[in-house]
């Protein structure tokens, strides 16, 4: 163990060995209300579907700069490796394509290279995050094979609200949040603006010599490129009658990734930046009959458009004035060229009804249409798909005794796809409560995911130390999955321990596979002369299995320690047509061991000064890939502090600061090879928040509760 590791371990021991007060305070984060697993409200401790929650208090203590930062730092099940294509997110070994990301129960939309843009979600406006692993819920679609992340946003009920939060950090990192809300009679409005910017950074100027003609040690390629994005959103709600509410909301988003150019052709010469324009519109309503029964209707439209923004004269794919395709079409500085325009329209009708004999029924209908326009990347320039679904779920409770209670939640979802037909996917979850301290849970669920238009029809070229050709595959088959999980939860005097074992078997898994160039269409090889060709193909079978362990221990009212560990084992096989046999294939980006840990201390120095301090760590073993090397293992530590100053009943000031990557770890693997982490090394940040709120529903900070809290059940 080297000196840095000893120092880190010593800090951890100091944090966890602080003596508890004699009056041990039982953590009541288990009183958190969750909705994601079943679509109905449950206390976390009584949720029949295993749900992990990142609470508002955890978010405040951690001070994350983005959703990616939050998930990576506070739960071991996630892995990220940010690049121009997105966050490269994984959950228990399965990538972004298998993870459903929701904001208040509604899907976010749009991706590049299969990666969602997590910058669409303003971290300052997050109330809490609920995570359900596996295709455990019939409510959100069986294509969520890896799991569901539901980001619950803050709900503002003040008569007048104005807030500003500004964060600055190393490498030109700027995060700006502005919110304005008001209520006039039965009408409420909230307008949100967010701005994010980073100058980017370069961990190394060396290129992988195996991918270049000679050694290059002065490359201009960045580890993370300079980028800027902003978003404006508006939400209106109207409540004409008690229990009846209508809403309308919309947003617009813009992002540009700036790519510096160098002097080595095919390596670091860049002639265009990447630009995105997103828009979304949604409307709907909720009719609450009584405390338990309700009907909701949601209709939404989303657009995600991706462009090249040219910075130099470039010859590329295009159509001449006569409509003929040419790979030598001239583009000039400031020209914009559409690469893909993804549009999605959805309608969702759902009802929740209480039935006799301790049953609660949820049922719904869903319609979805996907449209893709990509003039240079899809044959005929466009493709579309449509899916319909009907689902039903029952929640049943039986008490064998006052302390022994069984909850069973079965569900069925009937899926229909315009190209691949019908598929019925069943699910069942059960929880056995043994007293107030022990919970045993089990889940079995099936998933069904059809190929996307991009996986079927896409064709694109990526220049990265040479030309890489990526191809769709019209012969793809739908993916199916069987997910099994067993978990045990134990609670005792502030200690919460959860152990979960799982197996996720995916048949016909779709992934990018390197194929011989002679298997690609000849016209593409002649036009682009790629050094490697990758195509979407079905694997014969793939398995991810592992164990997740989570521990939280509330030592007293001020001290809390905890951590999580994830063990992952994967197995994937593909049929080799050349040798007519099954061969092992690596699931890209998987790491066998991941962990995270924390120790926090919160203290009220006075009624006008609440302070919090946190020490955090995370680690990962080697991440494995099919090509271009494996990512190195790493261990990163972080310190953060936050201070709230409620100077009056209307005004609140909040100051945050921290150091990330305390021991300055940097992965200097040459460009062209995979990194374990893209961190630039030690960074610092500071955030100032100013909030003015006025109205009869305004909640103020007292000795133990934050003025930022909007969920009355969250006290963690």
Language-model region placement:
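Outer membrane beta-barrel strand-and-loop segments of large Gram-negative receptors
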Residues: 344-350, 383, 389-391, 477, ...
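Periplasmic-side early beta-strands and strand-to-turn transitions of outer-membrane beta-barrels
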Residues: 158, 167, 182-274
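Gram-negative outer-membrane beta-barrel transporters
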Residues: 357, 361, 398-403, 503-505, ...
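Surface-exposed extracellular loop regions of Gram-negative outer-membrane beta-barrel proteins
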Residues: 305, 418-423, 436-484, 503-537, ...
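N-terminal periplasmic "start-of-domain" segments of outer-membrane beta-barrel proteins
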Residues: 29-59, 88, 99
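Short acidic/polar hinge/loop motifs at secondary-structure boundaries
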Residues: 106-133
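Extracytoplasmic beta-strand/coil segments of soluble accessory domains associated
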Residues: 68-106
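Conserved C-terminal beta-signal and adjacent last beta-strands/turns
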Residues: 20, 192, 237-239, 443-445, ...
């Amino acid at each position: 163990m080297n000196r840095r590791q000893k120092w880190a371990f010593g800090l951890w021991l100091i944090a966890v060995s602080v003596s508890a007060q004699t009056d041990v305070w039982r953590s009541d984060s288990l009183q958190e209300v969750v909705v994601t697993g079943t679509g109905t409200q449950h206390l976390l401790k009584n949720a029949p579907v295993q749900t992990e929650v990142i609470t508002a208090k955890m978010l405040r203590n951690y001070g994350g700069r983005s959703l990616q930062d939050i998930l990576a730092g506070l739960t071991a099940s996630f892995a990220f490796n940010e690049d121009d294509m997105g966050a490269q997110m994984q959950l228990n070994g399965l990538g972004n394509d298998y993870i459903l990301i929701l904001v208040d129960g509604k899907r976010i939309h749009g991706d590049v290279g299969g990666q969602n843009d997590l910058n669409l979600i303003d971290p300052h406006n997050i109330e809490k995050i609920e995570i359900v692993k596996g295709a455990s819920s019939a409510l959100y679609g069986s294509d969520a094979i890896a799991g569901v992340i539901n980001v619950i946003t803050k709900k503002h009920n003040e008569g007048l609200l104005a807030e500003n939060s500004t964060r600055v950090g190393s490498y030109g990192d700027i995060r700006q949040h502005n919110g304005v809300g008001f209520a006039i009679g039965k009408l409420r409005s909230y307008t949100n603006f967010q701005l994010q910017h980073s100058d980017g950074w370069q961990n190394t100027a060396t290129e992988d010599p195996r991918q270049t003609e000679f050694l290059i040690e002065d490359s201009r390629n960045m580890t993370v490129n300079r980028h800027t994005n902003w978003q404006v959103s508006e939400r209106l709600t109207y409540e004409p009658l008690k229990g009846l509410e209508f809403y309308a909301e919309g947003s617009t988003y813009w992002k540009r990734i700036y790519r510096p150019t160098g002097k080595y052709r095919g390596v670091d010469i860049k002639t265009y930046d990447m630009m995105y324009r997103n828009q979304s519109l949604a409307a709907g309503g909720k009719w609450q009959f009584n405390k338990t029964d309700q009907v909701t209707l949601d209709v939404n439209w989303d657009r995600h458009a991706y462009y090249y923004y040219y910075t130099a004269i470039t010859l590329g794919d295009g159509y001449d004035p006569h409509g003929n395709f040419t790979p030598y079409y001239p583009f000039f500085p400031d020209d914009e060229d559409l690469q893909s325009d993804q549009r999605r329209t959805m309608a969702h009708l759902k009802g929740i009804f209480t039935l006799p004999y301790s049953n609660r029924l949820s049922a719904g209908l869903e319609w979805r249409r996907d449209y893709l326009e990509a003039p240079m990347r899809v044959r005929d320039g466009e493709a579309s798909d449509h899916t319909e679904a009907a689902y039903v779920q029952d929640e049943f409770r039986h008490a064998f005794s006052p302390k022994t209670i069984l909850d069973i939640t079965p569900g069925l979802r009937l899926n229909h796809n315009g190209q691949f037909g019908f598929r019925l996917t069943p699910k069942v979850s059960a929880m056995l409560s043994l007293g107030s301290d022990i919970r045993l849970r089990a889940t079995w669920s099936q998933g069904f995911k059809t190929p996307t238009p991009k996986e079927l029809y896409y064709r694109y070229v990526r220049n990265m130390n040479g030309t890489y050709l990526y191809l769709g595959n019209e012969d793809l088959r739908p993916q199916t999955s069987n997910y099994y999980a067993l978990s045990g939860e134990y609670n005792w005097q502030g200690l919460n321990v959860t152990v979960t074992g799982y197996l996720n078997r995916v048949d016909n898994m779709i992934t990018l596979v390197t194929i011989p160039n002679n298997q690609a269409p000849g016209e593409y090889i002649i036009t682009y002369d790629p050094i490697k060709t990758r195509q979407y193909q079905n694997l014969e079978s793939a398995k991810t299995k592992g164990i997740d362990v989570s521990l939280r221990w509330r030592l007293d009212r001020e001290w809390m320690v905890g951590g999580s560990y994830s063990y992952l084992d994967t197995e994937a096989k593909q049929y080799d047509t050349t040798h007519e046999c099954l061969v092992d294939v690596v699931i890209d980006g998987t790491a066998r061991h991941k962990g995270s840990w924390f120790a926090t201390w919160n203290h009220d120095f006075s009624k006008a000064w609440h302070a919090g301090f946190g020490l955090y760590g995370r680690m990962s073993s080697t991440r494995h890939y099919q090509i271009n090397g494996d990512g190195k293992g790493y261990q990163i530590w972080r310190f953060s502090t936050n201070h709230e100053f409620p100077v009056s009943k209307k005004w609140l000031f909040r100051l945050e600061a921290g150091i990330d990557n305390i021991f300055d770890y940097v992965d200097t693997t040459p460009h062209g090879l995979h990194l374990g982490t893209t961190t630039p090394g030690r960074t610092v940040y500071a955030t100032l928040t100013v909030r003015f709120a006025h109205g009869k529903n305004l909640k103020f900070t007292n000795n133990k509760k934050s003025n930022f809290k909007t969920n009355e059940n969250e006290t963690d």
